[in-house]
């Protein structure tokens, strides 16, 4: 069993003082580890929500290295040509109530090959109490991406199309399967007043996770550094473990990772963390507006930046070109901030509510554009 040291005051698992770390390691060599508390809880986890376009683009980028534009094109083909998936340019991850009666037909349509057993299981599973993915209020123009009632011929799809189709079908099946049920064990131990923790998990019922061959959607806890998930033997409070092996792991603070297309899409959808001004009205407005761009335009925006040689890819990571760095030096600071989009959206909302006149807003934009132009002309840099 791997136990991780934990600061009782802060809850952190890192020690910045090397001497203190060595002192704790010395204690572990001289004193036993005593189990203070062993707590077991049965938990359940619902399936992830259905796909909207952005979430699908993120997954396709992470799994297959597909660009946002490539995923959109593949989705468009599956929608228009093969007619096996629903409308792709949606920003909703929910279904409307009128779709519920069609779910059985859609399950019949995907009840082939690798999906047959799962589809049959989903049909046997009662829908009562698990329609959390049905919410009319969270669907504006188009519902989440799901299979149509059209029977699919997998042999008619290209390899790339099959990959996208597979993502959508498995997600669709997952929301119709029972929750995943597991038993979580949390152990709190000590070595001479130093706190150590361990956490383990035992699967009780796989539920919706049967729709996935890997445990991609069971990573929430594993992503936390303060504990490690592991299979645990039978342990009880009061047990002593004599002279446990101890290891010190030295680490360094890493700079922020470069964007991939998937993480860039996430940042465009929710740019709040990149805002210097966290004014609540600005944050609320940009959230309601759906971030920078729309679900239908983000792929084209990213593609245009590549075509204009402002961005370049090295592997899956995105880098600025020298041309982009030149441009960013010339552009006034306000024009590079998400706050500007939020401010304009607020004013457009005021126009829609009759609180502001359209011609006044347009005149302000014209004046602002002239000021920007003059400011850029006086800059010393060139582009």
Predicted regions and their residues:
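Basic, low-complexity terminal or inter-domain segments flanking catalytic cores
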Residues: 21, 39, 68-69, 73, ...
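Conserved phosphate-chemistry cores used by DNA topoisomerases
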Residues: 1-84, 89, 98, 156, ...
């Amino acid at each position: 069993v791997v136990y991780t040291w934990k600061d009782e005051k802060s809850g952190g698992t890192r020690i910045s003082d090397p001497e203190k770390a060595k002192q704790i390691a010395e204690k572990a060599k001289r004193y036993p580890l005593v189990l203070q508390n062993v707590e077991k809880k049965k938990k359940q986890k619902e399936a992830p929500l259905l796909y909207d376009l952005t979430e699908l683009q993120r997954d396709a980028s992470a799994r297959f290295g597909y660009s946002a534009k490539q995923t959109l094109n593949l989705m468009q083909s599956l929608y228009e040509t093969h007619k096996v998936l629903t409308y792709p340019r949606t920003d909703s991850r929910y279904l409307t109530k009128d779709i519920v009666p069609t779910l059985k037909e859609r399950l019949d349509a995907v009840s082939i090959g690798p999906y047959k057993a799962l589809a049959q299981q989903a049909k046997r599973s009662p829908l009562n109490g698990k329609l959390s993915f049905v919410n009319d209020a969270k669907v504006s123009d188009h519902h989440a991406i799901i299979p149509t009632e059209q029977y699919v011929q997998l042999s008619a799809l290209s390899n790339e199309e099959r990959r996208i189709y597979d993502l959508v079908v498995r997600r669709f099946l997952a929301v119709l399967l029972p929750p995943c049920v597991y038993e979580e064990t949390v152990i709190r131990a000590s070595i001479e007043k130093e706190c150590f923790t361990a956490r383990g998990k035992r699967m009780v019922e796989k539920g919706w996770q049967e729709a996935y061959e890997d445990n991609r959607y069971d990573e929430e806890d594993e992503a936390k550094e303060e504990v490690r998930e592991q299979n645990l033997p039978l342990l009880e409070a009061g047990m002593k473990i004599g002279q446990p092996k101890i290891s010190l792991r030295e680490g360094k603070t890493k700079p922020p990772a470069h964007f991939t297309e998937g993480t860039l899409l996430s940042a465009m959808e929710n740019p709040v963390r990149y805002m210097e001004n966290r004014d609540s009205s600005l944050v609320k407005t940009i959230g309601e507006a759906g971030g920078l761009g729309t679900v239908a335009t983000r792929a084209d925006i990213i593609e245009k930046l590549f075509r204009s040689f402002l961005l370049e890819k090295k592997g899956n990571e995105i880098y600025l070109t020298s041309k982009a760095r030149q441009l960013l030096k010339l552009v006034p600071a306000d024009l590079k901030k998400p706050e500007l989009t939020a401010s304009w959206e607020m004013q457009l909302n005021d126009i829609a509510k009759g609180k502001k006149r359209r011609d006044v807003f347009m005149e302000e934009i014209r004046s602002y554009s002239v000021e920007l132009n003059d400011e850029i002309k006086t800059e010393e840099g060139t582009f």
